[in-house]
């Protein structure tokens, strides 16, 4: 790794488009990452989206592989991780979306399984905004788990499947569901409408 100024043992994540190797990301045991200089920005495991109508997007390669262990094949990872909430200019960081747009044209459901920290939430928001919130679903993890790999290690494959099965449709501004107003409706059912303002006329105020 040139970042460390020395050779080191690494995991190599190979990025393919079709049969063409377009990029390689290296990761050592200290979680230092490096990509091939000049490599193209695409999703990891992009070929797995061929002929799919649903997909899962993760924040890292290990998370994508964790879902694969749980039995999901239609999983990809972004190449550059989460997005710092303080950074304003992020277009170049999301170039992979433009480079892979054809793969998402026919997607009906897109599960956003990013990390639950601030950079992961920012990434999720940007992905939903660009891919279309009406077809995006938020994947949430159990308490104490930051990402899909945490869930797999701590709870196993079945729990990771539950995370997908219980995913929530991305909230769309201006649209409300009955469940969002459950407490208000229950109060209205049990207590009725509140009394209006007094008019001062007893016949009207009854």
Regions found by a protein language model. Give the residues of each.
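Short, small/acidic-rich helices and loops at N termini and domain boundaries
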Residues: 1-11, 48-57, 122-183
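Phosphate-handling DNA/RNA-contact segment within nucleic-acid enzymes
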Residues: 2-106
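Acidic beta-strand-to-loop metal/phosphate-binding motif
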Residues: 55-57, 103-119, 140
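A short acidic (Asp/Glu
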Residues: 66-70, 87-88, 121-125, 149-151
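Short hydrophobic alpha-helical runs that function as membrane-insertion/retention elements
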Residues: 74-77, 111, 136-139
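Acidic, metal-coordinating catalytic cores used for nucleic-acid/nucleotide bond scission
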Residues: 83-85, 114-124, 143
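A residue-level signal for conserved active-site and pocket-lining positions in enzyme catalytic cores
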Residues: 112, 148, 204
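The Walker A/P-loop phosphate-binding site
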Residues: 173-206
């Amino acid at each position: 790794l040139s970042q460390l100024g020395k050779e080191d043992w690494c995991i190599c994540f190979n990025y393919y488009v079709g049969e063409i190797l377009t990029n390689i990301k290296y990761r050592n045991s200290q979680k230092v990452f490096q990509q091939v200089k000049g490599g193209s920005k695409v999703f990891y495991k992009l070929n797995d989206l061929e002929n799919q109508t649903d997909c899962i997007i993760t924040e890292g390669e290990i998370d994508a592989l964790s879902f694969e262990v749980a039995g999901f094949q239609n999983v990809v990872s972004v190449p550059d991780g989460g997005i710092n909430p303080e950074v304003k200019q992020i277009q170049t960081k999301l170039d992979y979306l433009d480079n892979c747009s054809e793969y998402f044209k026919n997607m009906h459901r897109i599960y956003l399984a990013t990390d639950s920290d601030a950079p992961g939430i920012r990434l999720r928001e940007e992905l939903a905004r660009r891919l279309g919130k009406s077809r995006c679903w938020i994947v949430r993890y159990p308490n104490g788990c930051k990402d899909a790999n945490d869930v797999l290690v701590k709870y196993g494959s079945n729990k990771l499947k539950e995370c997908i099965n219980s995913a929530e449709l991305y909230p769309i501004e201006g649209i409300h569901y009955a469940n969002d107003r459950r407490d208000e409706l229950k109060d209205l059912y049990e207590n009725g409408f509140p009394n209006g303002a007094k008019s001062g006329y007893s016949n009207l105020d009854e």
